[in-house]
Amino acid sequence: MESVITATIIGASLLLAFAALGTAIGFAILGGKFLESSSRQPELASSLQTKMFIVAGLLDAIAMIAVGISLLFIFANPFIDLLK
């Protein structure tokens, strides 16, 4: 039983770590491409900024979904029922 709980905690930790890493890389790429496209066509900066904020919200949603899934695994572990 302890091995299932330990594996679940390690899995939830890895889930959060990779979600944070993916979000950070996504924000870095998004910010770089926004600055690059705004410097090429400054007249489209306001339109690009709106689209950038929409994509940034979607990137944050990925991390929030990972937090929800990891909290589910930590506090309401469905794998413990398989041992009974």
From Swiss-Prot:
Keyword S-adenosyl-L-methionine tagged: no
Gene Ontology CC annotations of this record: plasma membrane; proton-transporting ATP synthase complex; proton-transporting two-sector ATPase complex, proton-transporting domain
Compartments, record wording: Cell inner membrane
Site, as annotated: Reversibly protonated during proton transport: 60
Transmembrane segments: 9-29, 54-74
Molecular function via GO: lipid binding; proton-transporting ATP synthase activity, rotational mechanism
Membrane topology: Multi-pass membrane protein
PROSITE patterns in UniProt: ATPASE_C
Pfam families linked to this entry: ATP-synt_C
The keyword Transmembrane is annotated on this UniProt entry: yes
Keyword terms, alphabetized: ATP synthesis, Cell inner membrane, Cell membrane, CF(0), Hydrogen ion transport, Ion transport, Lipid-binding, Membrane, Transmembrane, Transmembrane helix, Transport
The family this protein is said to belong to: Belongs to the ATPase C chain family.
Function: F(1)F(0) ATP synthase produces ATP from ADP in the presence of a proton or sodium gradient. F-type ATPases consist of two structural domains, F(1) containing the extramembraneous catalytic core and F(0) containing the membrane proton channel, linked together by a central stalk and a peripheral stalk. During catalysis, ATP synthesis in the catalytic domain of F(1) is coupled via a rotary mechanism of the central stalk subunits to proton translocation.
Quaternary context: F-type ATPases have 2 components, F(1) - the catalytic core - and F(0) - the membrane proton channel. F(1) has five subunits: alpha(3), beta(3), gamma(1), delta(1), epsilon(1). F(0) has three main subunits: a(1), b(2) and c(10-14). The alpha and beta chains form an alternating ring which encloses part of the gamma chain. F(1) is attached to F(0) by a central stalk formed by the gamma and epsilon chains, while a peripheral stalk is formed by the delta and b chains.
Descriptive protein name: ATP synthase subunit c
Source taxonomy: Bacteria, Pseudomonadati, Pseudomonadota, Gammaproteobacteria, Pasteurellales
Gene: atpE
